[in-house]
Amino acid sequence: MKKLLAAAVAAVMTMSASMAMADGAIKIGEIGPLTGAAAIYGTAVANGAQIAIDELNARGGQQYELNAQDDEADAEKSVNAYNNLLDWGAQMMLATVTTNPCIAVGAQAYEDRVFMLTPSASSADVTADKDNVYQVCFTDPAQGTASAQYISEHNLATKVAVIYNNADAYSTGIYQTFDAKAEELGLDIVAVSTFTDDTTDFSVQVTAAKEAGADLVFLPIYYTPASMILMQANTMGYAPIFFGCDGMDGILAIEGFDTSLAEGLMMLTPFAADAQDEKTVSFVTKYQEQFGGVPNQFAADAYDGIYALAAACEKAGVTADTSVEDACDMVIAAMQEIQVEGLTGTMTWDATGSVTKTPTAVVIKDGAYVSAE
């Protein structure tokens, strides 16, 4: 946790320096949890976005300013942060990091005509009925479908169990499309167990999977409950393949967690830090030098999000003098015309705000994420 707080402070200090730039910069507001239980996500987003801002400004031409606000993954605090950013002069938002705050802020931004691009809020509800909210991340339905396809195409299991949070929109959204696609593909789902946000004992869920003979357990959940499930399975001597989605990214950074229990865990993610292409190597190197640690896919999505906003602004002719409302309409049109070659793939968007790109499968090996291919 101390490392997370240090990274958050470093991010804010870097952003403060960025905000001291001269007039003439397009102002981008960013909202996410820099403190609290979800700080792993929010700090990574702030850091990745800042690297992109620095690169864009270093190349000359149109300049950009980033102002990151902490919402502690709380919807009410997120709306307050949004209003603070409008008072600051934000012309568009890279926001928010988590789903429930994004839905709340998105509703307000729709009324105000402020363009929002979320790096990581993946629920379909984020963009529903809002023409001004776009996503860099995969949607929950897309993650569920892609996971079932990957498990089937790679013959990872003969029997599959699922453990998901039925009180969480992210988890439920992924499960629903996974279940539908698994049935279509003929995957044998032998056990489905649920839990809620306050669950700390997963013995019932793990026992159900074990007794059903599942050789793969699909976990469309966040990393904190996933770590508890891995500990419970280890206690019971149960060692199937555990398979998750982007919410699993961060499990290796949990303070006090025995990361050896995550060995062999697989997940679909848009980003693999061990990739050797020039863009990824450069990003990982800069991230390690500036913030320490290996960047996760949240950092990569944020980095790509800033570049997408810059590409849309350039395409549409947005400047520092463009009003918030005009910038919103101009960027909406441009987002449907641009193509961004990012860390997380080649990205295009349609009028629904959803992104099209291809996920990557990674596996934890020797305490690090590596490509599963």
Predicted regions and their residues:
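Sec-dependent signal peptide recognition
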Residues: 2-10, 14
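Extracytosolic ligand-binding ectodomains
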Residues: 4-7, 22-373
